[in-house]
Swiss-Prot record:
Role: Has antimicrobial activity. Is particularly active against fungi, and to a lesser extent against Gram-positive and Gram-negative bacteria.
First-listed, main subcellular location of the protein, grouped into a coarse class: secreted
Similarity field: Belongs to the diapausin family.
Organism from which the protein derives: Oiketicus kirbyi
Protein name (database record): Psychimicin
Tissues expressing the protein: Hemolymph.
One GO biological process term: defense response to bacterium
Keywords from the UniProt entry: Antibiotic, Antimicrobial, Disulfide bond, Fungicide, Immunity, Innate immunity, Secreted
Amino acid sequence: INNWVRVPPCDQVCSRTNPEKDECCRAHGHAFHATCSGGMQCYRR
């Protein structure tokens, strides 16, 4: 099972700090950020 989900609106924070990336994921209803390879990927809750 893939627990990552693409969150395109968070792509713009990929160059920022990890806490900012986590916050963007949370703002979109996810747990925290996984990776920005190919765009923001957040872990599902």
